[in-house]
């Protein structure tokens, strides 16, 4: 059953960091990878994570949660259920079966693209975009542009982890960006 505003207790997220495994030199030498699979397998940790995201957005009358491929698909449906909202996947090109809206964006060495079903968002629907990680902000920014091109009102963006030193938040200044856990290295 979806929660109601009065049923969300404050969640202290800092203990969740202990459930995230740090893997040095992955996927390449010099990178410290924050592996959330150890958090996902912990039923109380995963529940606390979803509760904390829900607590932040419960008062905002959200219509849709947009989950960015691929880990946004883990958190998005659970959050959508908790907020009594729908879930919409944002995918790489060629993965959705019906007519899609397409947005191409620049990467450091090339381009990438995202797609969403053209009928996924009705004009004026209130949307949250979720993913596991905010790093440089490029994919999140592209997702906001894709969603607003279909008429979405972006209420905010929610992330499990934010790598503060990569300054991805700067690309999303006009939005409420909420990250549960922050890392500065």
State the predicted function of each range.
Residues 62-69:
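Short glycine-rich phosphate-binding loop at a beta-alpha junction
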Residues 132, 137:
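Conserved G/P- and acidic residue-centered "switch" motifs that form tight phosphate/ATP-binding loops
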Residues 30, 65, 87, 157:
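Residue-level signature of catalytic and energy-coupling elements of molecular machines
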Residues 63, 125, 155:
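Conserved acidic residues
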Residues 2-62:
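Active-site-facing substrate-recognition patch
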Residues 74-83:
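Short Gly/Thr/Asp-enriched flexible loops that form oxyanion-binding sites at enzyme active sites
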Residues 85-128:
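Short, glycine/charge-rich flexible loops or terminal/linker lids adjacent to PRPP-binding catalytic cores
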Residues 2-8, 12, 18, 141-185:
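PRPP-dependent phosphoribosyltransferase catalytic core
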